[in-house]
Design a protein with these regions (language model features):
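N-terminal anchoring/stem segment of glycosyltransferases
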Residues: 1-92, 99-103
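Short glycine-aspartate micro-motif
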Residues: 107
């Protein structure tokens, strides 16, 4: 049985973020703060996921902001210009899940 654990790290450009009000007592919008925290903890999070996949004896795939994602995003922007980048990332995640289901038994 083929198994995989996958994750996405798609860094949305600042100008495409759907800005949310700051957390109480802060001045930075929530979306910027979240983006900063993901950037700051990228290696830690990735290494934890790799470690978990190794313990589960599964493959591990991390999808990032690469040409495949850019092509997918451009397609979405042309066909559905009203869809936010955040939602495109979520649709991309579903697409990758479907793609992996063609290869793996468990995802």
């Amino acid at each position: 049985m083929k198994r995989v654990i996958f994750s996405l790290y798609i860094e949305i450009p600042d100008e495409e973020l759907d800005l949310q009000p700051p957390y109480p007592g802060e001045e930075i919008p929530k979306t910027i703060r979240t983006k900063q925290l993901f950037q700051d903890n990228y290696e830690f999070l990735k290494n934890r996921q790799i470690s978990y996949a190794e313990k589960c004896d599964t493959d591990y795939i991390l999808y990032e902001y690469d040409q495949e994602y850019i092509d997918y995003k451009n397609y979405f922007n042309k066909k559905y210009p009203f869809v936010t980048t955040y939602n495109i990332v979520n649709f991309y995640k579903i697409k990758k899940l479907y793609d992996l289901s063609e290869i793996y038994d468990e995802i």
